[in-house]
């Protein structure tokens, strides 16, 4: 079952639902197989794509025999070249196995050809009874000379982690948008499916997309999405598929306008139609149509005026509290108000509430 990504994904989702802590892949904490210890589940490194059960078992046997790997350089010095080819090392890095040494995963990934060659050189030296670069030294603080690189942004890190595991484990791409999603009434698929609304906005990150054709040759798509609550699958009719084909890629996140279509007399059975697709970035960065800002008694009107001084597309309404009374004002001209303004204003102590 270690190589069955679908089963593993379901297994991990069930553990999350049961609030069982999952110890993420670690070169010094994990085992080749999944193992439960003290109510926690340690992720099995043999389940990482391209790594191979035998290879990771050999690497972990070395750890058990001679102690934990102290640094990444220590790992390089001790590992056998036959257990770490390019694909195997890529899988380990992308899954976060070496995060305890350095959370900058792309630093290691970008230097893999150099690392592989270094491991081979060390192995050859050992076979020839020559002292290796680090042999006989304390490697605790030794560093490998990595090549120049650009650190991954969180979105890139999670996309690469997804490739190595088949699902998101350390975090989810949608988590960073939680607050703005709440403000915009963007919900999880499960929330939308269970509520009574006929239409709603749902956010999802693409896990896979399959394009097919009907008997009449009309294209359609079947897309599997992931959100922070789980996974869901949607059917894309030809018009939606064709107009969005170029941007529908794995690991990209979207806000979907969904509509329930009850096709049977059984009200519990609902077909969900996709009416519109927008990238998350487009949604959160575009100006809001209308915003109401409720202010406490200690509001700073001059500061608010400065923050809302730029003309734009958003209708701004202010609700001012004074002596337990509320006064409503609408700014004469529309102003610029997007995610940037929201982030600044929501943290002001005199702002009671911002609604859209």
Where are the regions that the model predicts?
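Noncatalytic, beta-rich nucleic-acid-contacting surfaces in large DNA/RNA-processing enzymes
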Residues: 1-356
């Amino acid at each position: 079952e270690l190589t069955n990504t679908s089963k593993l994904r379901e297994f991990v989702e069930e553990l999350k639902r049961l609030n069982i802590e999952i110890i993420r892949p670690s070169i010094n904490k994990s085992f080749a197989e999944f193992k439960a210890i003290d109510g926690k589940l340690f992720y099995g490194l043999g389940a990482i794509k391209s790594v191979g059960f035998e290879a990771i078992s050999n690497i972990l046997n070395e750890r058990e025999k001679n102690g934990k790997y102290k640094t990444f350089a220590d790992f390089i010095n001790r590992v056998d070249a036959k257990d770490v080819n390019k694909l195997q090392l890529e899988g380990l890095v992308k899954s976060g196995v070496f995060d305890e040494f350095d959370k900058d995963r792309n630093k290691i990934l970008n230097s893999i050809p150099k690392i592989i060659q270094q491991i081979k050189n060390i192995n050859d030296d050992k076979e020839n009874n020559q002292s290796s670069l680090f042999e006989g030294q304390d490697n605790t603080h030794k560093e490998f000379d990595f090549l120049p690189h650009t650190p991954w942004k969180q979105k890139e890190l999670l996309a690469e982690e997804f490739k190595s595991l088949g699902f998101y484990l350390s975090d989810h791409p949608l988590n960073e948008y939680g607050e703005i999603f709440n403000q915009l009434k963007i919900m999880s698929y499960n929330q939308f499916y269970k509520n009574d609304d006929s239409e709603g906005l749902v956010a999802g990150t693409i896990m896979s997309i399959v394009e097919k054709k009907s008997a009449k040759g009309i294209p359609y798509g079947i897309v599997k999405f992931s959100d922070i609550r789980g996974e869901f699958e949607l059917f894309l009719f030809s018009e939606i598929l064709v107009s969005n084909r170029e941007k529908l890629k794995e690991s990209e996140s979207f806000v979907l306008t969904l509509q329930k279509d009850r096709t049977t007399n059984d009200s519990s059975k609902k077909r969900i139609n996709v009416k519109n697709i927008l990238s998350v970035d487009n949604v959160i960065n575009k100006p809001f149509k209308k915003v109401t800002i409720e202010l406490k008694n200690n509001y700073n009107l001059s500061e608010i005026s400065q923050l809302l001084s730029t003309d734009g597309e958003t209708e701004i309404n202010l609700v001012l509290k004074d002596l337990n009374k509320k006064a409503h004002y609408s700014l004469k001209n529309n102003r610029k108000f997007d995610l940037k303004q929201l982030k600044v204003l929501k943290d002001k102590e005199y702002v009671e509430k911002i609604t859209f």
